[in-house]
């Protein structure tokens, strides 16, 4: 006797009545409902069955309450708050040690929510609540259990709430927030079967109650949980793998990539409908399946576009364009695991396919379990359950953590090994090391209730609402992504979908609507992380779900479309705060500094070494400088009264003219440039990506000698004014001066920059200082030691939040290493001829 699926997944929801089941066969889409009539989120229930086997392991059939007496036992817990912090997966190189969550709480058991174990017998039993647990004295229910009329077990998950202790800090971290927990959970499922005068103990299963699936219309992510577990067993020599079959082993990779077009705008561009690599087009399907020698160069070219899971080199431009286990924000070009790769087994099949070493046995698509041959039904249930969950990146993950790749944690038939009947309250010392975590005598050997979800973010809302944080202005506002197949990035809205399917509208209008993708988080997204997370806790169930919908019948668009549906908001937000605001422009070396005395642009590497850029034409006193996502530099030429564009190859052209002492320039997320014109009646020009210039802030608006510009995290344009010694806030759309003296009392303010913590650093000329402020313009204390600054002008920040300041009086760029409220200043690049603006150009 065995319980199937071996690992079943439920997903939290706050509806009292609405629920649906996950897939029973691979690729099956849940039917919903995904919201109830009041807008609450439906629960995904996990259903477990028992199958009987003969002595040779052959499947005899499903065992139900009609022919047997079945007693189910369910034991689940949530131990997140008692566990350790989440940094990186412990099974990758150089994973750091992590401290306990809530380390100051002595009674660790008070942080464990352990529901009273439940037993059910027969068909139609229950429901019984999974209650009896509490968090710091507050009762927490983890769901309920019941059986259907045939005696199958149904696990209903919790309500999806987050819980905090009095006085807990607001949510701020994506994975670790002391004083908080949620009501996700996991634990073993066991069953005793009495049949034909015999009493048999079924092979146990595991239930995981996870966060919602916000994209039930997407059947699978590129790397599934089943892929990761199967690959781990294969690499350990515990699972034989046969010859590569295109339809079974290779085609899903391309199908899944194409499906991401509905949840990520970058994949719409690269692999979506109408793109050059829409693999689901029949012509591509046939060519991909072509095993002939003539087609080998094509197959090899496609396969070479995928990242090698050996991770021997950094390959940021390859597929998949998703972040990996070791990602940092901003990502660097040192650690290969900053990006996700296929599993080693997937990659093995891909390489075999590229060589032509594959078959293609196409089988009929099965959509119901009853159509699956009996002997394949148990394994089908197991695979379908795990295939609908993500197998990476484990940072920490959506439904399941990195422990999926620990082969000895699994039986050969994909069951988790139960090691303890008690939850683990983090009794492995004040810090958990990689060696302990991976030890066969470590916590994984004691896997018990709560032992899976404890490795996940707490509460789940924080991680789910942080999945856009990596978008970078300097690279792409849409790629890489984290887990779009379950937590969308960009969606086709209901309103745009209605335009697309309306055949009475013009084709141009419909195409424009089809290409429009809205930020999925737009209803809760704020300029900074904490208020976004707070809104997610309150309104997580209002977020739309991406459902499968019929396309128009005229053949000009996909026949099936995946559409954001049931969003619980009456109107669209007035502003969509781009996720790039959470992390400034990707600051990779080298940086480029403009030098006005010799009209040069000099590239400075991470060691401070300088190389003049080769330019096709001279610049007329370069001052301010910025960069677009394609690597073009835009330079304010003070004497020539123009903005020059410098391509990555050094070709210089006039991008905008008719300016008046242009001295500073910045760029927004849409590629618009803003230029400060340094005059007594100062004004700001706005230049579109196509080069159309207009006056954003007129000379009559009251700006006096504007000299520095930066985009604020809340979307405002900040302008430093040398005349009155102020920083003004400006609406970058209307040009209205929102606050002429947002910061005042400065003696020669100049360049500005925000770091990754949203601290504003402002160079002040005549006091030879760099001031620091919070996002509201409040001064923050900071003191400097080391080399003195000399009339600071340009200010930039690198990936480690080190500040770089050009000093026009000393002809150097200084580096400031900030720690807390102090910074150490040193000369970084010397001998520069009157350095001005700085921009990172890596």
Language-model features and meaning:
Residues 604-609, 646-651, 687-692, 731-735, ...:
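Short loop/turn segments that connect beta-strands within beta-propeller blades
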Residues 590-593, 632-635, 672-675, 716-719, ...:
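Conserved beta-propeller blade signature
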Residues 596, 638, 678-679, 722-723, ...:
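Short loop/turn segments immediately following the C-termini of beta-strands
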Residues 600-602, 641-645, 682-686, 725-729, ...:
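A short loop-to-beta-strand structural motif that recurs across blades of beta-propeller domains
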Residues 1-588:
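Aromatic- and Gly/Pro-enriched helix-to-coil junctions and flexible linker segments
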Residues 609-616, 651-657, 692-699, 736-744, ...:
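A short beta-strand motif characteristic of beta-propeller blades
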Residues 617-630, 658-670, 678-681, 700-715, ...:
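Beta-rich, blade/repeat-based domains predominating
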